[in-house]
Regions:
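Acetyl-CoA-dependent GNAT
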Residues: 1-41, 52, 112-113
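Conserved catalytic-core motifs of GNAT/GCN5-like acyltransferases
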Residues: 18-21, 68-71, 88-105
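Short secondary-structure boundary/hinge segments and terminal tails
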Residues: 29, 60, 77, 100-101
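C-terminal "cap" of GNAT-fold acetyltransferases
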Residues: 30-32, 85, 95-113
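Conserved acetyl-CoA-binding loop-helix of GNAT-fold acetyltransferases
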Residues: 38, 44-61, 76-84
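Conserved beta-strand-loop-alpha-helix junction that forms the acyl-donor binding cleft
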Residues: 43, 69-79, 96
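Conserved GNAT acetyl-CoA-binding A-motif
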Residues: 59-71
Length: 113
């Protein structure tokens, strides 16, 4: 099922993380896709890295094989964040997203657990 964690400081939510199966169907039950959101004020302070550690640790205990990220090609800091945590770019899907009035590529990244 869907897993969810919250990072807080001084009783305020500063970030959250979740993961769920990459695609429907039993054939994908060992591949998860995650989302991590950290408040701008707390970026580059280790919050995202800590949340990712929790996500991947939890998934690994459940015998999950891989954690996936779908990142907008425009979001270079997020791509670098994932690369710093051993995610590898495995595909780039051209113009599948729409942001800021234009179509954008989706970068698929994977970490083997």
């Amino acid at each position: 099922g869907h897993e969810f964690w919250v990072a807080s400081q001084d009783d305020k939510i500063i970030g959250f993380a979740s993961y769920d199966q990459l695609r429907g169907g039993v054939g994908y039950r060992y591949s998860m896709e995650h989302t991590i959101i950290v408040s701008e004020k707390y970026k580059s302070m280790g919050v995202g890295k800590n949340l990712m550690g929790i996500l991947c640790g939890h998934a690994k205990k459940r015998d999950i094989n891989s954690m996936w990220a779908g990142v907008s090609a425009l979001n270079v800091p997020a791509i670098k964040f994932h690369e710093g945590l051993d995610f590898k770019i495995v595909a780039r899907l051209p113009k599948v997203g729409y942001k800021f009035g234009t179509f954008v590529d989706l970068v698929l990244m994977r970490k083997i657990l």
